[in-house]
C-alpha cells in the first residue's frame, strides 16, 4: 500500500480550490525563474516540480513563493544540523529505532495529507528529537517533490510519552522545525491531533504554546486514551489500525514509505551544494527567513516551573 502520487482528478481539484490552472502555473514558474536569475545570492538549482508545489502550497501567491525560495536555500546556513548532511539511510535507520512516522497513502476527500507519528520509545534516553526533526524534514523535502495537497493533518500518538521526552525536546528546535516546515517547504498544518493524551499533556501543551504560532495552537485537538473522538474529524480509513482505524498496519505503512527514499539517497546528499551565499545578498534585501519567519535559533530546552 505505497504512498500514492496525486491522481489527475486530485490535481484538478486542488487547482480548482485555489482558483488556478495549468497555464497560470506555467506563467507563475516563468515569473519566479526570472526573479531567481536576478538573485545573485541564490542557487538556480530548483526544478519546476518543486516550484509548482511551492506555488500551490503558498496559495498561488508569487511574493510568498519568492520568500519561500529564499528561505529554502538560506535556512541551510542557519540550521545546518537540520538541513545539511542528510543521508536518508542514516537518519531513517536511527529514527525507526525509537519512533514510527509515515504519511497515509491516500489523500482525504478534501485533498489533505494525513501523517502519523506513533510507537515512541518508552525510555526517554532512547529518544532523539534532533534525529526525529531531521526525519520530518526529509519527509517535507520528499513531499515538495511529489505531493499535491491543500494542507496537512497530523496525528501524534502520545502513548508512552513521559516527562523525560518533553524535557528533552528543545523549544528552539521546535521553533526552527516549524519555521522550516512552514517557511521553506510551505506546508500548511490544518490540524494537530494528539491521541492517547498522557498525564503529562499539560507539559506538552506548555511546549506547544512556547514553540508554535497562535494560528497553529488553535488547531490542536487532544483525544483521551480509549476515546473515538478522533473519528469525529477523520474517517477510519485515514487512520492506521493500531489507532482504531482501518488504514492498515502502522509498520507496514511506514516501511512502504521508507522505500521511497532509497532511490533518492544521492539526490538528498547533493542538495548540500545548493545553499545561499549571504555575502552576495543585495544590501537592500532581507533574508527570507527574517521576513515573517524570524525566531531565536538557539536550541533551548523547555523549562517548566
Where are these regions (language model features)?
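Basic, amphipathic alpha-helical/coil surface patches used to engage anionic, phosphate-bearing ligands
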Residues: 1-305
